[in-house]
Amino acid sequence: MKEIYFGGGCFWGIEKYFQLIKGVKKTSVGYLNSRIRNPSYEQVCSGYTNAVEAVKVEYEEKEISLSELIEALFEVIDPTIRNRQGNDIGTQYRTGIYWTDSSDEKIINDKFLKLQKNYSKPIVTENKKVENYYLAEEYHQDYLKKNPNGYCHIKFD
């Protein structure tokens, strides 16, 4: 089982989206690469922590590759916009792919180079090592399962 972390705006929709993908075995939402230990949602929203709202995705490599997961992410984000997705604006909503296995860095870089041809503006999605990851509060976990009519910048129709 491998793990990768995705930032793509509000983590509620990104989590639901990846839960629907074959080969993804487990997800959680949290705050990634924070300046402070165990930040609260309010602290993250203030911008002080510089944390990203992120989804930890655990997946079976025999069923889906990292390259395919990146393509899936790019289906629901605009990788050319910094600190915003949909109506969500702030540094916590920046897009990124974050890794714990250093061999993933090259896969991500290579994929960005291939995908760049699809965009007239440069891709600004981050490709960085996970420095820390703190689980978000319980009410954020599986939010759109618990609240099917909740706000989401991703359309699931």
Curated annotation (Swiss-Prot):
Q: Which Gene3D superfamilies match?
A: Peptide methionine sulphoxide reductase MsrA (3.30.1060.10)
Q: When the coding gene is removed by deletion, what phenotypic consequences does the entry describe?
A: Decreased agglutination to sheep erythrocytes and survival in hamster lungs and increased sensitivity to hydrogen peroxide.
Tell me which EC number(s) this protein carries: 1.8.4.11
* GO CC list: cytoplasm
Decide whether keyword 4Fe-4S is in the record. no
**InterPro entries linked:** Met_Sox_Rdtase_MsrA_dom (IPR002569), Met_Sox_Rdtase_MsrA_sf (IPR036509), MsrA_MetSO_reductase (IPR050162)
* A Pfam family recorded for this sequence: PMSR
Q: What are this entry's molecular-function GO terms?
A: L-methionine-(S)-S-oxide reductase activity; peptide-methionine (S)-S-oxide reductase activity
**Catalytic function, reaction form:** L-methionyl-[protein] + [thioredoxin]-disulfide + H2O = L-methionyl-(S)-S-oxide-[protein] + [thioredoxin]-dithiol; [thioredoxin]-disulfide + L-methionine + H2O = L-methionine (S)-S-oxide + [thioredoxin]-dithiol
Highest taxon of source:
Bacteria
Keywords per UniProt: Oxidoreductase
Uppermost EC category: oxidoreductase
Instruction: State which residue ranges cross the membrane.
Output: none
Active site (record annotation): 10
User: What are the GO BP annotations of this UniProt entry?
Assistant: cellular response to oxidative stress; protein modification process
Q: Which family does it belong to?
A: Belongs to the MsrA Met sulfoxide reductase family.
Spell out the PANTHER family in the cross-references: MITOCHONDRIAL PEPTIDE METHIONINE SULFOXIDE REDUCTASE
Q: What does this protein do?
A: Has an important function as a repair enzyme for proteins that have been inactivated by oxidation. Catalyzes the reversible oxidation-reduction of methionine sulfoxide in proteins to methionine.
Please name the HAMAP family in this protein's record: MsrA
Q: What is this protein called?
A: Peptide methionine sulfoxide reductase MsrA
Q: Which organism is it from?
A: Mycoplasma genitalium (strain ATCC 33530 / DSM 19775 / NCTC 10195 / G37) (Mycoplasmoides genitalium)
